[in-house]
Amino acid sequence: MDLPPQLSFGLYVAAFALGFPLNVLAIRGATAHARLRLTPSLVYALNLGCSDLLLTVSLPLKAVEALASGAWPLPASLCPVFAVAHFFPLYAGGGFLAALSAGRYLGAAFPLGYQAFRRPCYSWGVCAAIWALVLCHLGLVFGLEAPGGWLDHSNTSLGINTPVNGSPVCLEAWDPASAGPARFSLSLLLFFLPLAITAFCYVGCLRALARSGLTHRRKLRAAWVAGGALLTLLLCVGPYNASNVASFLYPNLGGSWRKLGLITGAWSVVLNPLVTGYLGRGPGLKTVCAARTQGGKSQK
């Protein structure tokens, strides 16, 4: 399934046009709420917004690259910079969504015990660990195994390959024999692990909702709030990481599905602000947490 270059260009441009204002508004809204009362959820939302804004800024260049059928339009030395700006948020976003889901689950399932550890300083530490983990893992994989890396033994610039047509390509002409295991390791640690955490927390939140005293309407809304993070992981970032697994299992699969996965991943900059903004506004799990906390106090 190979999309026409014009369609890929249009999808990247649309994601940028929608994602940039949405993420700016999300960051401004989270900052305004943080000035009144900083919570762990706001810390995760701020870091997710900054990560998505970095991805959004890289989308115009990705659109130009798609219109040129994958040819790299800038100097070769800028390919590593683009790789960090584009691929780092794709993986870091899953970590922030998993952290946000874990905080919501702990607040709903263990309201009394979680209150003792519900401090923003701990959340900042979690976010710093996510930034460091993703950056170090990406740096090791790209620096060692990418075209022009330490293990590649070629004279090209880092990340740059020149296929038979003579046009330089940034990362997308990577040798499948080395690209498959490298990308699979990234997906395994930085996507499937956060996905498993988010899914577990979603199920736990549903169980907490089933035992709560909320009305049916509020239960439905809270269930949607709890599932927002899981939804964006599956719909946006899931296809890209599925293509990484497929290319690892079948090295000769081709890059068509990867191109489609990169486009769906770009649209996470549109869905993520909607998910975090809705989580911040809705009564959902905050109401559950408050109700269960009050119930715990009344039992004493």
Swiss-Prot record:
Matching InterPro entries: GPCR_Rhodpsn (IPR000276), GPCR_Rhodpsn_7TM (IPR017452), GPR40-rel_orph (IPR013312), GPR40_recept_FA (IPR013313)
Site positions for Important for receptor activation, renumbered to this chain?
E145, E172
This protein's UniProt keywords: Cell membrane, Disulfide bond, G-protein coupled receptor, Glycoprotein, Lipid-binding, Membrane, Receptor, Transducer, Transmembrane, Transmembrane helix
A GO cellular component annotation in the UniProt record: plasma membrane
**MF term (GO), any:** G protein-coupled receptor activity
* Glycosylation-annotated residues: N155
**Topology, Cytoplasmic side:** 32-41, 102-121, 201-223, 280-300
Per UniProt, what does mutating R258A do? Strongly reduces response to linolenic acid. Strongly reduces response to synthetic agonists
Topological domains, Extracellular: 1-8, 65-79, 143-178, 249-256
From the record, give the cysteines joined by S-S bonds.
C79-C170
Tell me the PANTHER family matching this sequence: FREE FATTY ACID RECEPTOR 1, FREE FATTY ACID RECEPTOR 2-RELATED
Please give the family membership noted in the entry: Belongs to the G-protein coupled receptor 1 family.
What name appears for this protein in its UniProt entry? Free fatty acid receptor 1
Please name the source species.
Homo sapiens
Gene name for this UniProt entry: FFAR1
